[in-house]
Amino acid sequence: MKIAVAGSGYVGLSLGVLLSLQNEVTIVDILPSKVDKINNGLSPIQDEYIEYYLKSKQLSIKATLDSKAAYKEAELVIIATPTNYNSRINYFDTQHVETVIKEVLSVNSHATLIIKSTIPIGFITEMRQKFQTDRIIFSPEFLRESKALYDNLYPSRIIVSCEENDSPKVKADAEKFALLLKSAAKKNNVPVLIMGASEAEAVKLFANTYLALRVAYFNELDTYAESRKLNSHMIIQGISYDDRIGMHYNNPSFGYGGYCLPKDTKQLLANYNNIPQTLIEAIVSSNNVRKSYIAKQIINVLEERESPVKVVGVYRLIMKSNSDNFRESAIKDVIDILKSKDIKIIIYEPMLNKLESEDQSVLVNDLENFKKQANIIVTNRYDNELQDVKNKVYSRDIFNRD
């Protein structure tokens, strides 16, 4: 089967690689550098499994800048373009998704479009009405950055949308896509759910908001423990050995961040509109409170250090270990709060060659020099290369994992 994938981020590329084991896949992107890398068997993103599969597996995959040619020949078109949260309108910016829909429909009269981008509840219904077609369906993704292909190979569940009154072809394509994902997975007995588009859209937003809730819960627990000088590690262990709670997603941090959780929680809150709620709003608020608390704690520790020059060293901007993504990283908001207090910030981030022009921080990518300059070293996730300056480190990473 010929499949086109719009977007080569961790969602699009991981799906493209997965499906190219048994199908002919064309990745569409607007960046020549990404297209060149994929066509040379290199991954433009950091993902161990994607890198290995591109290098070592027999894949039928190519990348192109020629979107119309790719869409014209495709039987299925997967849309995995960004839907960033627009704080001005308090809603996802879906213009990239809509642009692809319009382009595909203009050159292809038979392909079914499968949206993998995270979208607002009701978006598929809106697009079907706008473009007067039922050939647009939704399949939420449940992937972790840097482990996206692994999560596609070992999925927790597969969800594809379909409506009762859809045409036989669209129904068949929805089932076909679910089967493609299931047959490519290495995990056996993966649950497959076919449901309405709005329900599938809700699953995605509520699932990520629950994960954000867990992060916020254990962060608030940690805030209490640190404030009362209690052992946060022991409290969390004592709670998490309860099977109903579990020993996962319980490691304190500076706040939830990354590409998905911040925007998905805000979008779900916006979707509530006039529907009664308090919990969803509290999750978003809790994350902001946590980042403010962390900044205050850093300032308190800094003031205790007897030094005429106060320098905060930020070790890594990435949100998670083994990630190459700084988007919506909680530490960036903490940095902004510290800078508003006229505190000098130096940053160690080997994935950057320079900071943005308006950033008043200083990039110091010589690790030993960084360690010497900083009075306190702040890190969301601890790394063993800080072991020799452990007395300088402030982190709430209790379990040394994400």
Curated annotation (Swiss-Prot):
InterPro entries: 6-PGluconate_DH-like_C_sf, 6PGD_dom2, NAD(P)-bd_dom_sf, UDP-Glc/GDP-Man, UDP-Glc/GDP-Man_DH_C, UDP-Glc/GDP-Man_DH_C_sf, UDP-Glc/GDP-Man_DH_dimer, UDP-Glc/GDP-Man_DH_N
Residues that bind substrate: 141-145, 204, 208, 249-253, 257, 320
Source domain of life: Bacteria
Disulfide topology: none
EC category name: oxidoreductase
EC number: 1.1.1.22
Keywords from the UniProt entry: Capsule biogenesis/degradation, NAD, Oxidoreductase
SMART domains: UDPG_MGDP_dh_C (SM00984)
GO molecular function: NAD binding; UDP-glucose 6-dehydrogenase activity
Reaction catalysed by this enzyme: UDP-alpha-D-glucose + 2 NAD(+) + H2O = UDP-alpha-D-glucuronate + 2 NADH + 3 H(+)
Positions contributing to NAD(+) binding: 2-19, 29, 34, 83, 118, 145, 259, 263, 327
GO BP field: polysaccharide biosynthetic process; UDP-glucuronate biosynthetic process
Keyword NAD carried by entry: yes
Active site residues according to the UniProt entry: 260
Pathway(s) served: Nucleotide-sugar biosynthesis; UDP-alpha-D-glucuronate biosynthesis; UDP-alpha-D-glucuronate from UDP-alpha-D-glucose: step 1/1
Protein family per UniProt: Belongs to the UDP-glucose/GDP-mannose dehydrogenase family.
PANTHER family, per database record: UDP-GLUCOSE 6-DEHYDROGENASE, UDP-GLUCOSE 6-DEHYDROGENASE TUAD
Protein purpose: Catalyzes the formation of UDP-glucuronic acid which is required for capsular hyaluronic acid synthesis.
Full protein name: UDP-glucose 6-dehydrogenase
Gene coding for it: hasB
